[in-house]
Amino acid sequence: MNTNEVTLIDDLLSNEENLALINKLCYHQWYLTKCLDYGNLISPLFAGRGGGFSVSSLEDGKPFNSPLNKEAYKITEKVCEQLNIKKYEIKRFLWNMYFPRNHTEFHKDEYTDDFLSILYNPHTTDGGTFINNKFYVDKISQAKVYKSMVEHKGNPPSKDSVRFNLNVLIKCFK
């Protein structure tokens, strides 16, 4: 995969699986996302510039006991199969929840060439993701796959009430 390339993979989960996943996400415990430009979470939250909410279900290659991991593993396996990635290690499952007016920053998930980011959308929203300064709107059951060292940022919804996604970080081996 080239550094500036974004691969879109559709129809990873059925509509029923996505609805069940969203139901799990609605009842899951969430944490305020740390904003890169603030040392304190309270000020940006009350100023309407909070970064949304997130929760990890796998960190540094170690899974947590989470009801979200079943779908995350399935999505990761399907993406790697379609991209013919045979040897990889899952480093992170990070779930995000955004509301209108949330503030996000451009960032990199990793800094070396051997990592890929998989961004999965369980529903269609008017939010999306900027990758290499190009906007990709959320589409139900679609994954956006790109080099983790590429700058990107989530974009909250403006008309839709909430936006969920899964960010998977994998290390690929040759």
PLM ranges: what are they?
Residues 1-87:
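Non-heme Fe(II)/2-oxoglutarate
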Residues 56, 61-174:
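Catalytic core of non-heme Fe(II) oxygenases with the double-stranded beta-helix
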